[in-house]
Structures are given as structure tokens and as C-alpha cells.
């Protein structure tokens, strides 16, 4: 595979709907052989996953990576807890931010960069129902304005 940034292999689209993402951090992810092969095929899912700081390390939970078809007995557990690779200062910063009420770590994207699998995680705060409705109204208003401008010209 050529060096450089590759395509996004998995994306958590629901995160931007359910959370206000305040900051993003790129982290490496510790994987087994059959897991990386399965991810390169595009069979990873971030939908219900979340990250947490535990005993000075960051782990991602409920990230589903489908078993590799040719892996037979060497296959992995699809919902295994996986360690994220971050520097100590980054971990301490994330720990401080998530101790505040209402903040959590949400996996946003999974991609290949320079041959290594990386995950973009976000420090996020949950949206209330009225925030979601307000965002939907603003999106609809922008769409209407764009339609009107398109018809005008």
C-alpha cells in the first residue's frame, strides 16, 4: 500500500448528531493481525463505540470489527476492548476534560495514515433534544436559502 494518508475506513456519522464535538485528537490503535486485515477490507463499525480513560490508558469499547474470513482459528473477538496509543500529556489532558460533568470521548473516524491505522477521537458534550431540533431547523433554513439562490441565478 502506498505511503501517505489513505481513505476513511469507518466513520461515526451519528456522533455529530448526538454530540457537540469540542476538540479532536488523532490516536494510534493497537490491533491484532486479523483485525487490521479486516479493517483494510472496510468491515469496521464505530456506531455504538465510546472511549474511556482507565488506569492511565485510553481504551475504546464496543467498536465492532468483523472477523477476517480467512483467519479461521486465529480470528479475534469482534467487540474486543482495544487500547489507543497516545502520549502521556495527551492522556492526562483527556482525563481532565472527561472528569467534567457531561463530557465524553467519542470515536469519530478510523483511517490509514502512512501505513498505520489511526483513530480520530473527539472530546464531546451530549446534545439535548432542543439542540438537535435547533440544528435541524438551521440546516433546513440553509437548504431553503441555497435553493432560492439557485433558482434566482
From Swiss-Prot:
<dbReference type="GO" id="GO:0003723">
    <property type="term" value="F:RNA binding"/>
</dbReference>
<keyword id="KW-0963">Cytoplasm</keyword>
<dbReference type="Pfam" id="PF01668">
    <property type="entry name" value="SmpB"/>
</dbReference>
<dbReference type="GO" id="GO:0005829">
    <property type="term" value="C:cytosol"/>
</dbReference>
<protein>
    <recommendedName>
        <fullName>SsrA-binding protein</fullName>
    </recommendedName>
</protein>
<comment type="similarity">
    <text>Belongs to the SmpB family.</text>
</comment>
<comment type="function">
    <text>Required for rescue of stalled ribosomes mediated by trans-translation. Binds to transfer-messenger RNA (tmRNA), required for stable association of tmRNA with ribosomes. tmRNA and SmpB together mimic tRNA shape, replacing the anticodon stem-loop with SmpB. tmRNA is encoded by the ssrA gene; the 2 termini fold to resemble tRNA(Ala) and it encodes a 'tag peptide', a short internal open reading frame. During trans-translation Ala-aminoacylated tmRNA acts like a tRNA, entering the A-site of stalled ribosomes, displacing the stalled mRNA.</text>
</comment>
<dbReference type="InterPro" id="IPR020081">
    <property type="entry name" value="SsrA-bd_prot_CS"/>
</dbReference>
<dbReference type="InterPro" id="IPR000037">
    <property type="entry name" value="SsrA-bd_prot"/>
</dbReference>
<dbReference type="GO" id="GO:0070929">
    <property type="term" value="P:trans-translation"/>
</dbReference>
<keyword id="KW-0694">RNA-binding</keyword>
<dbReference type="InterPro" id="IPR023620">
    <property type="entry name" value="SmpB"/>
</dbReference>
